[in-house]
Curated annotation (Swiss-Prot):
GO BP annotations listed: biotin biosynthetic process
Cofactor: [4Fe-4S] cluster; [2Fe-2S] cluster
The Radical SAM core domain, residue ranges: 51-278
Pathway(s) the chain acts in: Cofactor biosynthesis; biotin biosynthesis; biotin from 7,8-diaminononanoate: step 2/2
Protein's organism: Histophilus somni (strain 2336) (Haemophilus somnus)
Protein known as: Biotin synthase
CDD domains: Radical_SAM
Keywords, in A-Z order: 2Fe-2S, 4Fe-4S, Biotin biosynthesis, Iron, Iron-sulfur, Metal-binding, S-adenosyl-L-methionine, Transferase
Length: 327
């Protein structure tokens, strides 16, 4: 199958959208911490109810054996991380997990497959899975890697609501993290997703030895997507033994909160998801993230192959903070 590059105005100014230069975003990062959180909270309240939170559950439907060399990922076939490879799960098993997620309050069911990208033969089964989960009354999101021509349209027709395709890190830092694809590969698939009419879930990871300027570059790249992503997951690196980033320098908690706040200010109408890494965050840190504009979490004890807070703990935290699930 021939893959045609789609030209998309991803990182160019738009007359109806504020253009965020890296310098401008970096200046936001330099704002005194409490003032930055306050500004982000004000922006958040203009566009969202600050006392509701969107709950998503993420399930790995095909695990391990990925040919990519992403330095953060325990599912890469290039690293010895103890992850057990698992082929694409059957529809029935996925539907059972989706039913449990719905019964526990999740409104969106996200499915991830460890591929560079799906092959044409995989799409038939994926569309069957999407239809079955949609029949439960859940929103659906898929993260299956780089898409070939026509695949996004097939996923849309099956009922997929969101496609997750993170840009990972700033363009300037990309080759330090991934060598088997480049930044433009991600933009190409994002263009196909938009063209098919799917909603975009697109974010990145912080704590991968990047500089603050490179964190600003990540946020600027996301904020200048046209249109901006409906959902922006901000992940804190989960360091896994066996991956090249297992010994990455620890990111100070205030810097992570700053990243959430800057994402909220630059993407005021997007859901900002407090994503991977929550297991290592205190309740106080998570509360600061919600104050700074995060209004979505992954809900469930596992994120693909890494640990996530258990539902009971999240319910308790939400009760303490008077947060209610979005309906």
């Amino acid at each position: 199958m021939t893959i045609t590059t789609i030209n998309i105005p991803s990182l160019t100014p738009h007359p109806c959208v504020e253009y965020w230069s890296v310098c401008k975003v970096e200046a936001l990062f330099e704002t005194p911490f409490l003032e930055l959180v306050y500004q982000a909270a004000q922006v958040h309240r203009k566009h969202f109810n600050p006392q509701t939170i969107q709950l998503s559950t993420l399930m790995s439907i095909k695990t391990g054996g990925c040919p990519e060399d992403c330095s953060y990922c325990p599912q890469s076939a290039r690293y010895h991380t103890g992850v057990q490879n698992q082929q694409l799960l059957c529809v029935e098993e996925i539907v059972e997990k989706a039913k449990i997620a719905k019964s526990r309050g999740a409104g969106r069911f996200c499915m991830g497959a460890a591929w560079r990208g799906p092959k044409p033969k995989d799409i038939g089964k994926i569309t069957e899975i999407i239809k079955a989960v949609k029949d439960l009354g859940l929103e659906t999101c898929g993260t299956f890697g780089l898409l070939q021509d026509g695949m996004a349209e097939e996923l849309k027709e099956a009922g997929l609501d969101y496609y997750n395709h993170n840009i990972d890190t700033a363009p300037e830092h990309y080759k330090e993290i991934i060598g088997t694809r480049d930044f433009d590969d991600r933009l190409n698939t994002l263009g196909k997703i938009r063209k098919a009419g799917l909603k975009v879930c697109c974010g990145g990871i912080v704590g991968m030895n990047e500089t603050r300027k490179e964190r600003a570059g990540l946020i600027a790249s996301l904020a200048n997507l046209d249109p901006q992503p409906e959902s922006v997951p901000i992940n804190q690196l989960v360091k896994v033994e066996g991956t090249p980033l297992a010994d990455a320098q620890e990111l100070d908690w205030t810097e992570f909160v700053r990243t959430i706040a800057v994402a909220r200010i630059t993407m005021p109408k997007s859901y900002v998801r407090l994503s991977a890494g929550r297991q290592g965050m205190s309740e106080e840190m998570q509360a600061m993230c919600f104050m700074a504009g995060a209004n979505s979490i992954f809900y469930g004890d596992k994120l693909l192959v890494t640990v996530n807070p258990e539902e009971d703990g999240d319910q308790l935290l939400m009760a303490k903070l008077d947060l209610k699930p979005e309906t």
